[in-house]
Amino acid sequence: MARRILVVEDEAPIREMVCFVLEQNGFQPVEAEDYDSAVNQLNEPWPDLILLDWMLPGGSGLQFIKLLKREAMTRDIPVVMLTARGEEEDRVRGLETGADDYITKPFSPKELVARIKAVMRRISPMAVEEVIEMQGLSLDPSSHRVMTGDSPLDMGPTEFKLLHFFMTHPERVYSREQLLNHVWGTNVYVEDRTVDVHIRRLRKALEHSGHDRMVQTVRGTGYRFSARF
């Protein structure tokens, strides 16, 4: 599935060029020409990344970032600012407000795509990874599927993220706090016991195939994902 990118840019020639480049590189661009239309695009399916101009009719890029960070469903969407404001102070303001990267106009299409991919690797590794396999269990980040052989396993989005983290970090013990930081993120305030709830749900989802044994409790420490039973 193509990664969905919201392009928020009021200058039509730049917006159209960016969308063309994104399509040529396998992304799915969604256009917004001003602040209000950008806000209206914040719904499911959520964008995987937002390219955001600094100055917009109806509001500023910084205001838009602040709006994103206030809402639980949008606060983790990565943002790359796309603007003519190249002064160091402006770059710092953008990054401190919550932007993940900053591209100054004019820019090359190659640099734009490279920066988008770099941000996705850093912020959302599942967006660029191949299928992960372990002991007959396979997880495909692109299609968001977990399989055992030809049989799909049904699980919620949090359990999927938890399993993805475990399968990319096997044989290591993680405390509840570490799992919260890695899977939920440092900006989300939830209790440690939330991890236990989702561990139980993950085990339940893996139970039919027998892979629930791989999610192991390490008493007094936390949890480990292991092929050693």
Curated annotation (Swiss-Prot):
Q: A GO term (biological process) for this protein?
A: phosphate ion transport
- Please list the residues that carry the modification 4-aspartylphosphate: D53
* Molecular function via GO: phosphorelay response regulator activity; transcription cis-regulatory region binding
Matching entries from PROSITE patterns are given as: OMPR_PHOB, RESPONSE_REGULATORY
Q: Which Pfam families match?
A: Response_reg (PF00072), Trans_reg_C (PF00486)
Record-linked PANTHER family: PHOSPHATE REGULON TRANSCRIPTIONAL REGULATORY PROTEIN PHOB, REGULATOR OF RPOS
Designated name of the protein: Phosphate regulon transcriptional regulatory protein PhoB
Q: Which organism is it from?
A: Klebsiella pneumoniae
